[in-house]
């Protein structure tokens, strides 16, 4: 019994380290993306940056959840609240991106080229799958729906990186102004789905474990 408790504490500590890294990485990623996106007028890049800031919120709530892992009642209560906070944040972001991307499409407003955005998307494609896999292992070992949801969130960030990179490259290479708002619009249902599942408190990461 004591050995199992100590092992669980060790796993929870590993989860905390992953969330500290998530907060640090996504703060940097979000700042670079939002600043570069604002300078280039890229809604997909700004949306990607805001998604990174939501991951910061998610990381902070997961740290909060991990801090009471030994207390079953508080753990379950924090677990549900963590999922809802992340879910609401996702829905708000989906609404914002949908509005801005449709506005840009109707106004035929394309962004300027963003080398910083392209580099950021490539780096994110390397970092996020590794982070998602590590979180998924911790979530599986702890039986934590909130950690599993956060792992899935990191995995979806990889998908968003692919969409972002595609839009930026198409615009840079072919001059397709509509590629950026279209990329942002494609992100919207993915983000909204994650938000709805978070609010419902669903464990979204069985495949990540």
Predicted regions and their residues:
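Alpha-helical transmembrane cores and adjacent cytosolic helix/loop segments
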Residues: 1-209
């Amino acid at each position: 019994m004591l050995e199992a408790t100590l092992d669980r504490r060790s796993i929870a500590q590993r989860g905390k380290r992953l969330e500290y890294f998530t907060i640090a990485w996504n703060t940097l990623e979000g700042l670079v993306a939002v600043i570069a996106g604002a300078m280039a007028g890229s809604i997909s890049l700004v949306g990607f940056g805001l998604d990174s800031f939501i991951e910061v919120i998610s990381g902070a709530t997961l740290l909060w959840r991990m801090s009471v892992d030994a207390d079953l009642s508080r753990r379950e209560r924090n677990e549900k609240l963590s999922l809802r906070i992340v879910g609401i944040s996702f829905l708000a972001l989906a609404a914002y991106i949908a509005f801005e991307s449709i506005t840009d499409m109707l106004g035929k407003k394309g962004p300027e080229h963003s080398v910083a955005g392209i580099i950021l998307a490539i780096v994110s494609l390397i970092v996020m799958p590794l982070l998602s896999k590590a979180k998924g292992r911790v979530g599986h070992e702890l039986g934590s729906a909130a950690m599993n949801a956060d792992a899935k969130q990191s995995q979806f960030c990889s998908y968003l990186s692919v969409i972002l990179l595609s839009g930026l490259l198409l615009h840079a290479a072919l001059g397709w102004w509509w590629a950026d708002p279209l990329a942002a619009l494609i992100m919207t249902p993915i983000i909204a789905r994650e938000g709805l599942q978070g609010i419902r408190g669903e464990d979204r990461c069985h495949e990540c474990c």
